[in-house]
């Protein structure tokens, strides 16, 4: 059975709608170039919702973006780039006040380092009043990245209002906690993440995020807690170790694929887009695990994300057919295989 069987009352067709902030990344052309040094950089569109929506479009989905930009050159560049990627930007609000956030990247031996210039960015000032319920109602899936919940009250309120609209109209809710180190975590922030996760139909944390959300270490306990919150489909991305997908009593693992990692920017957002696309295509759980794993892997092999590293549907299918990407069903310790549901 395919993933659509998890959501019997969901709309059979429709677009994927992403809510969030567009950013512009300045990516160095050399991995040894530091922010304190002169050198050449490439401008590329970023922001979780921007990367997600472009990835969904590249994978064959009809996808739209909800957000707010300014009328500055950086905003125009971001919107035009996303639109050229096949995303419907007609519902992006154009504001006379402010510009989109900027991020400058450097590659350090211990990982990536971002210098953000996004405080009070126009994108973070998207509000519930900027939402059009008719637009949300027409979607099949609404996707939100969790880091929006910690930017400010304005966009946080928009996120929860958009979910309320989605629930009123039978729109599936996809949520990626996207917990960022530069934002606060714990206390009220954790409660907001848990509140949003409990309203999601599709949940995609990393393993570290799943542990933070649940307070558990064992993966079976983690899945029990996450499903207990409400999501029917849970996908846990594990960086180089691949991914786990859980639904309908089944758990499938797709091990990591050995490739040279150039830049992991956007891999999680593209993985989330792939997961939503798998639901649209009604893939069986094992095929979905392989598909998502392949998408996340391919993104890591190139620098940048939008217009540079996001793979096409054909590229993903080619990697799936190569035999390098596997998936296997996992059986809970101490449970008979026949007792562990067949599910999706």
Put a short name on every predicted segment.
Residues 20-22, 147, 177, 270:
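Active-site metal-binding loops of divalent metal-dependent hydrolases
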Residues 141, 147-224, 241-243:
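Conserved beta-alpha-beta core of the PfkB/ribokinase-like small-molecule kinase fold
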Residues 2-17, 164, 215-344:
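Conserved phosphate-binding/catalytic region of the ribokinase-like
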Residues 60, 86, 168-170, 230, ...:
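Glycine-centered short loops/turns at secondary-structure junctions
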Residues 134-135, 195-196, 227:
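Structural alpha-helical scaffold elements that stabilize or flank donor/cofactor-binding regions
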Residues 62-146, 316-344:
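Conserved N-terminal subdomain of the carbohydrate kinase-like
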Residues 56, 206, 268:
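Short, conserved phosphate/pyrophosphate- and ester-handling motifs at nucleotide-, phospho-/glycolipid
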Residues 2-88, 262, 326-344:
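Glycine-rich phosphate/adenosyl-contacting loop at the front of the ribokinase-like
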């Amino acid at each position: 059975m395919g993933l659509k069987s998890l959501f019997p009352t969901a709309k059979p067709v429709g677009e994927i709608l992403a809510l969030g902030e567009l950013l512009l990344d300045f990516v160095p052309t050399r991995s040894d170039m530091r922010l304190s040094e002169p050198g050449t950089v490439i401008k590329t569109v970023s922001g979780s919702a921007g990367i997600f929506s472009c990835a969904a479009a590249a994978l064959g989905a009809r996808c739209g973006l909800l957000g707010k930009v300014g009328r500055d050159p950086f905003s125009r560049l971001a919107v035009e780039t996303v639109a050229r990627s096949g995303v419907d930007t007609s519902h992006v609000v154009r504001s006379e006040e402010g510009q989109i956030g900027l991020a400058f990247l450097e590659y350090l031996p211990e990982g990536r380092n971002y210098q953000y210039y996004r405080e009070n960015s126009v994108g973070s000032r998207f509000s519930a009043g900027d939402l059009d319920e008719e637009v949300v109602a027409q979607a099949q899936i609404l996707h939100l990245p969790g880091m929006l919940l910690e930017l400010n009250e304005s966009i946080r309120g928009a996120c929860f209002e958009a979910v309320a609209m989605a629930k009123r109209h039978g729109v599936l809710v996809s949520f990626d906690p996207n917990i960022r180190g530069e934002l606060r975590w714990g206390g009220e922030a954790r409660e907001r993440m848990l509140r949003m996760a409990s309203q999601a139909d599709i949940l995609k944390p990393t393993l570290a995020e799943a542990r933070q959300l649940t307070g558990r270490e064992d993966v079976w306990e983690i899945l029990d807690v996450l499903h207990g919150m409400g999501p029917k489909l849970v996908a846990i991305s594990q960086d180089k170790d691949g991914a786990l997908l859980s639904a309908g009593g089944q758990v499938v693992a797709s091990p990591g694929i050995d490739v040279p990692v150039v830049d992991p920017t956007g891999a999680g957002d593209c993985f989330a887009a792939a997961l939503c696309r798998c639901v649209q295509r009604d893939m069986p759980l094992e095929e979905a695990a392989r598909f998502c794993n392949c998408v996340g892997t391919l993104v890591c092999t190139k620098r940048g994300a939008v217009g540079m590293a996001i793979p096409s549907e054909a590229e993903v299918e080619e990697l799936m057919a190569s035999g390098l990407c596997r998936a296997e069903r996992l059986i809970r310790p101490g449970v008979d295989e026949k007792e562990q549901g067949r599910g999706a």
